[in-house]
């Protein structure tokens, strides 16, 4: 049988409607970050990011450096966050493309700092805290000291701090509440250490709809942009 291409037709008007619905549910003052990782979950990252920005998204987020560079190559100049880690050897590309990088290891932050100094630029980073997702991040008790070390480096702006919920999409919010507690304690410790971080974010798709108290400074809209519940 001959090979046949497969495609999906995306109603960008419906996508725009979804963004407006999401925006209407965000607490006043919170920024909207549209997550378009994995080619916007198969919907096309470039088209989805354009619609998101047209509908007032403040930030675009992806998972990898290659995804971020693809958007920059397409002409996007908006704030762009990589949610995953990169190797220190990729610092030049991150700084050169004005990408905001997630960090939790000092070797990466130091490489970004050195490259930013070399290029005469300031690189923005977001510190990720492991509160129960089991992925990447510093331990909550180490967050304040890590933030102090980052803030002391030249040409690095610690713009954000965040964490990921593990079970926010299920009815029982017991574990989610524990994650919120750990995140808040870590953020308070960072502030007490004299480091002010302007963008704190932990709310993702499920929390946008069900836990408005944790919208804080920014929310990350993922699968709900496309009309799906996170656990579907």
Region annotations inferred by a language model:
Residues 1-100, 114, 122, 157:
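A charged N-terminal "starter" segment
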Residues 3-4, 38-55, 114-118, 131-232:
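Active-site loop/helix belt of alpha/beta enzymes
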Residues 13, 17-20, 107-110, 145, ...:
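Short, contiguous clusters of charged residues that form electrostatic/catalytic patches at enzyme active sites
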Residues 62-63, 81-87, 104, 123-130, ...:
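Non-cysteine beta-strand/loop elements that form the S-adenosyl-L-methionine
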Residues 65-66, 85-88, 106-109, 205-207:
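Short beta->alpha connector loops
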Residues 71, 127, 204:
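Divalent metal-coordination and catalytic microenvironments
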Residues 97-133:
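A generic, well-ordered mixed alpha/beta core segment in the N-terminal half of proteins
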